[in-house]
């Protein structure tokens, strides 16, 4: 949720953010009205409760002649208090709904627009000239790394088996990511992949894209699309000690996405699938430290991309493609030879206080006063990276060179048919 002080003091900033995202700025006015109505309802209920309390005291001191009228007055006030509290509850509910409807306020400089309106910040490496490149699925099948046919037989479309060296390659990639994370002060976590609705809602994943999330209706639980979700809920309703600096966690988990809005997109191979594995960095920090932590997350992602030796670029994601929780997001996109374009491998988002406010995650400032923490997240490795590794390191004979950093995990320098 956004900061109400910002809303009240400078609603135009929030309206501008909504417009840049392609979202309705009228929601800002609806929230302002709901905020006013809520505060009015709270004040009315408080005043009536005070009046009721005073009337009750008068009853105890009243003479026999005065008592009947005062008792009637107390009874009337009790009914009014009951009605006022119901009105307050209704106003609170309307306010919460209006508050939850507004996305995080973007940072100044974030490009306006949608998916195609990003700004390229940096390009690293030169794509290698490959004559008649094979795509990752053709390579994966010929090398015995990927089995889409049996994945579909067992589970349906967009499912797959990673087999033999393919499984070793993914495990090696994820282990390398955990090594980078631990060396940089992250605590490694293997979190649950089923979460309660309040945690999924608190992280912002039950808004406009709720249809992307798998729900187990019988248990009212959700399968996570990223370990960002359980890691964000890890410190819900807590006051953290951040006096020694940010708390950094790296979550290794399977992830699940319905890809409901992706019909017809990336139907071949493992670029867009329903289940994959990922190591996700997640950080709790003071708001004033968040931008520096964001750059650090991006730096660790660059370190991982350098390790797999693929050309990539860094983009500043446009406001309409951020997701509701992020105030700024950087994507690292790797070159995919068969598509002659760059495809997303990592994202890192600065969610400022948006998620922590929803989940009531706080820290104590220098004066001991509780304040809302900031949260950030960023991919350190995921299954999709196999696409970039296989395609960029393919050889004319159909083999694939294993990046040096992954050789100890795969136990070979070349994957051969």
Swiss-Prot record:
GO biological process: selenocysteine biosynthetic process; seryl-tRNA aminoacylation
EC number(s) given by UniProt: 6.1.1.11
Listed name of the protein: Serine--tRNA ligase
GO cellular component terms, A-Z: cytoplasm
Principal cellular location given in the protein's record: cytoplasm
Gene Ontology molecular function: ATP binding; serine-tRNA ligase activity
Pathway info: Aminoacyl-tRNA biosynthesis; selenocysteinyl-tRNA(Sec) biosynthesis; L-seryl-tRNA(Sec) from L-serine and tRNA(Sec): step 1/1
Keywords of the record: Aminoacyl-tRNA synthetase, ATP-binding, Cytoplasm, Ligase, Nucleotide-binding, Protein biosynthesis
UniProt-listed PROSITE patterns: AA_TRNA_LIGASE_II (PS50862)
Cytoplasm found in the keyword field: yes
Record's subunit section: Homodimer. The tRNA molecule binds across the dimer.
Gene responsible for this protein: serS
Organism annotation: Mycolicibacterium smegmatis (strain ATCC 700084 / mc(2)155)
Intracellular or extracellular location(s): Cytoplasm
Classification via CDD domains: SerRS_core
Binding site for ATP: 257-259, 273, 344-347
Role played: Catalyzes the attachment of serine to tRNA(Ser). Is also able to aminoacylate tRNA(Sec) with serine, to form the misacylated tRNA L-seryl-tRNA(Sec), which will be further converted into selenocysteinyl-tRNA(Sec).
Domain notes: Consists of two distinct domains, a catalytic core and a N-terminal extension that is involved in tRNA binding.
Keyword Protein biosynthesis: yes
Catalytically driven reaction(s): tRNA(Ser) + L-serine + ATP = L-seryl-tRNA(Ser) + AMP + diphosphate + H(+); tRNA(Sec) + L-serine + ATP = L-seryl-tRNA(Sec) + AMP + diphosphate + H(+)
Family: Belongs to the class-II aminoacyl-tRNA synthetase family. Type-1 seryl-tRNA synthetase subfamily.
Pfam families attached to this UniProt entry: Seryl_tRNA_N, tRNA-synt_2b
Chain residues that bind L-serine: 226-228, 280, 379
